[in-house]
Swiss-Prot record:
Belongs to the polyphosphate kinase 2 (PPK2) family. Class II subfamily. Residues 269-495 are annotated as: PPK2 2. This is Polyphosphate:AMP phosphotransferase. It comes from Pseudomonas aeruginosa (strain ATCC 15692 / DSM 22644 / CIP 104116 / JCM 14847 / LMG 12228 / 1C / PRS 101 / PAO1). Changing residue 311 to A: Almost loss of activity. Changing residue 316 to A: Almost no change in activity. Changing residue 304 to A: Strong decrease in activity. It catalyses: [phosphate](n) + ADP = [phosphate](n+1) + AMP.
Length: 496
């Protein structure tokens, strides 16, 4: 896989200087067209052998192009803030928006490679990391990102010659770093595992480009031309090709009986039983959150449901048991301009809680397979692939010790109508009823189908859905609290 990058490529000075003039002009033009169209972001991953010119090439790209439209990100040791969250969080929060370019040093490939080379992880863990990287990149590209992956290469002989030359040169010996010497010691293992990573993750939508790094002029021109040709091709394509679904469209149940039809919405708690059970579950929650075992966890609660199903009231009964410093409520509405410039999961990743914290999502990433599906805000291919992307997202949260609980609060049409009318009559509740609520009511059956599909495809052992019978608000509130408490206790038992 690296043979063509060990043959001794070189470019003479005159050829280089002539080519650079045209290349710089074309790159700048493409960069400003990217900004003008603002249809997709560009993500450049920098990997390969230490000393093969990675830093020098990126520095040159910043000189050739407008650095105001480029964000260079270096992922070295995780910060304390990053260590408190799943590993992917640090990458998600630094993704470039549409129209801009992000250059990632020390990205997900660097971390998995060094971890395996240094023996911190086993073969199976490396394979898991490779699979996760491939899924992440597939999603980024499906969301429109243009991804370039560069491997800067030197043969073992070229690396040793470079180290010796720099060591003897008083003016340039400062360029040597401990990583350069370390690379020389582990070269064979690094290249072995590097080849494995490239072989497994070079795809048509995100191929690897192996660049020989010995000659700086050849290296710079090669990278510049790859970027230019890729950018020009993407900019000239008015609509990026989207992956088409391979399965038949989802259909309604043949007997017209859906998952929500199986709920007993007549379940009820009288006032005295409600007060007693509510107080008991709130006290239980307060104790579980204060337990020292919660230091290894955080909590994410997702609230979805029919309009007027009582999500707000249920959330308030949960937070009544907590210190305001422990929780954060994230209300989800239509995405902002900033959020539309990113993959749809970006605005949820940025709110993932640190350890010992509790985040409540009032509406969530499930909008992709509910309102966006029903209103046609995204293509069928997009919401069909979202089921797998959401499962992957929640699995990453769970693997890091985040307890994920998900609620669908269900009411019948008659109860919803009664609550709508009550809201219209009550001045301090009138703000809760909108034209959108009435439009959603007209699409009741479509939501029934969408909710059934959502639960069937995303209710997993690590993040199951809880369907809450919410015609009676008291019953619903207690069930929500009890479910959260049961989930925390189950997580504590697994810790043992």
């Amino acid at each position: 896989m690296f043979e063509s990058a060990e043959v001794g490529h070189s470019i003479d000075k005159d050829t280089y200087e002539k080519a650079v003039i045209e290349l710089r002009e074309a790159l700048l033009e493409a960069q400003f067209e990217l900004k003008q169209q603002a249809r997709f972001p560009v993500i450049i991953l920098i990997n390969g052998i230490e000393g093969a010119g990675k830093g020098e090439t990126v520095k040159l790209l910043n000189e050739w192009m407008d650095p105001r439209l480029i964000e260079v990100q270096s992922f070295l040791r995780p910060s304390d803030e990053e260590l408190e969250r799943p590993p992917q969080w640090r990458f998600w929060r630094r993704l470039p928006p549409k129209g801009r370019t992000g250059i990632f040093f020390g990205n997900w490939y660097s971390q998995m490679l060094y971890a395996r080379v240094e023996g911190h992880i086993k073969e199976a863990k490396l394979d898991q990391a490779i699979d996760a990287a491939e899924r992440f990149e597939r999603m980024l590209c499906d969301e429109g990102a243009l991804l370039f992956k560069f491997w800067f290469h030197l043969s073992k002989k070229q690396l040793k010659e470079r180290l010796k030359a720099l060591e003897k040169d008083p003016q340039h010996s400062w360029k040597l770093s401990p990583l350069d010497w370390k690379q020389s010691e582990v070269y064979d293992r690094f290249v072995h595992y590097g080849e494995r990573v490239l072989r497994r993750t070079s795809r048509d939508y995100a191929p690897w480009y192996v660049v020989e790094g010995a000659d700086e002029r050849y290296r710079a021109l090669t990278v510049g031309r790859i970027l230019l040709e890729g950018l020009q091709a993407a900019l000239a394509t008015k609509e990026r090709a989207k992956r088409q679904p391979h399965a038949a469209p989802l259909v309604s149940s043949l007997d017209n009986r859906g998952l929500l039809d199986s709920l007993d919405l007549g379940q009820y708690l009288d006032k005295d039983a409600y007060k007693e059970q509510l107080a008991a579950e709130q006290a239980r929650l307060a104790g579980l959150i204060r337990d020292k075992r919660f230091r290894q966890h955080s909590l994410v609660a997702v609230f979805e449901g029919n309009d007027a199903a009582g999500k707000g009231g249920a959330i308030r009964r949960v937070t009544d048991a907590l210190d305001p410093r422990q929780y954060h409520i994230v209300p989800i509405a239509a995405p902002t301009e900033e959020e539309r410039a990113q993959p749809y999961l970006w605005r949820f990743w940025r709110h993932i809680p640190a350890r010992r914290q509790f985040t409540i999502f009032d509406r969530s990433w499930y909008g992709r397979v509910l309102v966006e599906r029903i209103e046609g805000f995204c293509a069928p291919a997009d919401w069909l692939r979202a089921y797998g992307e959401i499962n992957d997202f929640e699995e990453q949260l769970s693997e890091y010790g985040i307890i994920v609980v998900k609620f669908w609060l269900a009411i019948d049409k008659q109860t919803q109508m009664e609550r709508f009318k009550e809201r219209e009559k009550t001045p301090y509740k009138r703000y809760k009823i909108t034209e959108e609520d009435w439009r959603n009511r007209d699409k009741w059956d479509q939501y029934v189908d969408a909710v059934g599909d959502m639960v069937d495809r995303t209710s997993t052992e690590i993040a199951p859905w809880t369907l809450v019978e919410a015609n009676d608000k008291r019953f619903a509130r207690v069930k929500v609290l009890r479910t959260i408490n049961d989930a925390i206790e189950a997580a504590y038992k697994k810790d043992k």
